[in-house]
């Protein structure tokens, strides 16, 4: 009974080894991973449950399986961090590793072995094998050297090869993919993403975390200050670019780094990347009759083709003005309680309105920032570079040529792993040049 169990365990191990080293199995895994990645792209990730209930209702127009209950049940709202997706990545990496150890490395070791032929009958298996007239092994070797072959001679037999990098490259392709997956998983489980809407002149810390991994670390040993926020406009009043002037401070308020960021030009600090993503207007500062400065909050109103910011200026209980801003270009419009336009004002100027002197001091903008940490990025970039390089190198043909001399007759033949027609033409050139020398 024990013997049978041992045989069964051995059979299982061999079955798993063959399965994981099978190219078709790896391709199927890759297609499954790609399919779930597409699902993760189609379905919005890391949203609140209310969002999925509103957009993927059970009785909605979506396919009956694609409803919020199934999305929540199978983790399709956070596909890339689910246990089953990470398991698929692990199995795929294991398959590549087993394939490299059981197939690619032994194949490379076989390619490095010198193999000399002794019998002309061995050349019958080669396509394009030939017989060279009137030459010597020395002359043939000299011709092969001009075609960049590595040559080894044993008696009346020559073995040569070139393009060994083409056999080595698939191992690096597999290793690069494994490193790429490791870097991606590292970013998923230990990275985080935060969003902050910060008024100009204010400090902020990392608080509004919108996504994080199981092992994420949120640093709290620094703060950041938005020194200024400005928007550049085109001649047609459309936005050209918006900028945030940011200082990174330590716990004592000492500036550690200072940078002005804009879209596609983030700030880098200790593994964190701060992106410029959005902007808003939160208030306007005014003075009425030289009293203390008042900060009037503004509410954003989204219109079909535009957006405006609206605030109320209360001069007294019965006299209120509505202030409307369209942008940061220091122009505003005042309306009375009836909705009638009173006048346009310029920020930075004083106006006499309803027996009051109102000074419109400044607009208080806020900048939308996204802060990301992804420890796997260096690994991903490095592995992707090696992946592209090794894939390119893998297209180098690995060619082998054998030559023997038997009774003053010279036989030449060879094999290659790709570009068979080109190799046969090269073999013909070697034969012709060797016989003409």
UniProtKB/Swiss-Prot annotation:
Zinc as a keyword of this entry, yes or no, is: no
Organism, scientific name: Porphyra purpurea
The alphabetized list of GO BP terms reads: cytochrome complex assembly
Q: What protein name is recorded for this chain?
A: Cytochrome c biogenesis protein Ccs1
Question: Which Pfam families does the record match to this protein?
Answer: ResB
Its annotated compartments are: Plastid, Chloroplast thylakoid membrane
Q: Which residues cross the membrane?
A: 23-43, 82-102, 168-188
Reply yes or no: does the keyword Transport apply. Answer: no
Record membrane topology: Multi-pass membrane protein
Q: What does this protein do?
A: Required during biogenesis of c-type cytochromes (cytochrome c6 and cytochrome f) at the step of heme attachment.
- Spell out the PANTHER family in the cross-references: CYTOCHROME C BIOGENESIS PROTEIN CCS1, CHLOROPLASTIC (PTHR31566:SF0)
The entry describes its oligomerization and partners as: May interact with CcsA.
């Amino acid at each position: 009974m024990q013997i049978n169990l041992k045989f069964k365990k051995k059979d299982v191990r061999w079955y798993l080894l063959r399965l994981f080293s099978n190219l078709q199995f790896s391709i199927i895994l890759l297609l499954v991973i790609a399919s779930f990645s597409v699902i993760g792209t189609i379905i919005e990730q890391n949203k609140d449950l209310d969002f999925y209930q509103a957009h993927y209702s059970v009785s909605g127009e979506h396919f009956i399986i694609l409803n919020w209950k199934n999305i929540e049940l199978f983790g399709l709202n956070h596909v890339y961090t689910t246990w089953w997706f990470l398991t698929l990545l692990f199995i795929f990496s294991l398959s590549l590793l087993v394939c490299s150890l059981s197939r690619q490395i032994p194949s490379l070791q076989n390619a490095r072995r010198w193999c000399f032929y002794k019998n002309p009958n061995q050349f019958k298996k080669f396509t394009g094998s030939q017989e060279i007239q009137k030459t010597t092994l020395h002359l043939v070797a000299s011709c092969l050297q001009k075609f960049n072959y590595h040559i080894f001679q044993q008696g009346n037999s020559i073995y040569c090869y070139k393009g060994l990098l083409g056999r080595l490259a698939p191992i690096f392709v597999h290793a690069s993919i494994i490193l790429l997956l490791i870097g991606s998983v590292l970013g998923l489980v230990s990275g985080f993403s935060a969003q902050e809407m910060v008024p100009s002149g204010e400090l902020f810390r990392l608080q509004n975390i919108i996504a994080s991994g199981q092992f994420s670390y949120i640093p709290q040993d620094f703060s950041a200050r938005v020194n200024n926020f400005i928007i550049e406009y085109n001649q047609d009043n459309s936005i050209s670019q918006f900028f945030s002037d940011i200082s990174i401070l330590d716990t004592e308020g000492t500036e550690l780094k200072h940078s002005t960021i804009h879209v596609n030009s983030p700030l880098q600090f200790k593994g964190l990347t701060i992106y410029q993503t959005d902007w808003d207007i939160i208030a306007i500062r005014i003075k009425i009759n030289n009293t203390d400065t008042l900060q009037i909050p503004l509410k954003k109103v989204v219109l079909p083709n535009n957006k405006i910011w609206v605030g109320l200026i209360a001069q007294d209980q019965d006299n209120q003005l509505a202030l409307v801003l369209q942008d940061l270009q220091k122009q505003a419009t005042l309306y009375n309680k009836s909705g009638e336009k009173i006048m346009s004002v310029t920020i930075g100027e004083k106006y006499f309105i309803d027996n009051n002197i109102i000074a419109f001091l400044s607009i208080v903008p806020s900048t939308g920032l996204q802060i990301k940490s992804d420890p796997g990025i260096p690994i991903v970039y490095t592995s992707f570079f090696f992946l592209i390089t090794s894939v390119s190198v893998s297209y180098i043909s690995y060619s082998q040529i054998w030559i023997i001399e038997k009774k003053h007759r010279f036989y030449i033949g060879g094999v290659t792993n790709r570009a068979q027609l080109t190799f046969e033409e090269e073999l013909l050139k070697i034969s012709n040049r060797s016989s003409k020398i």
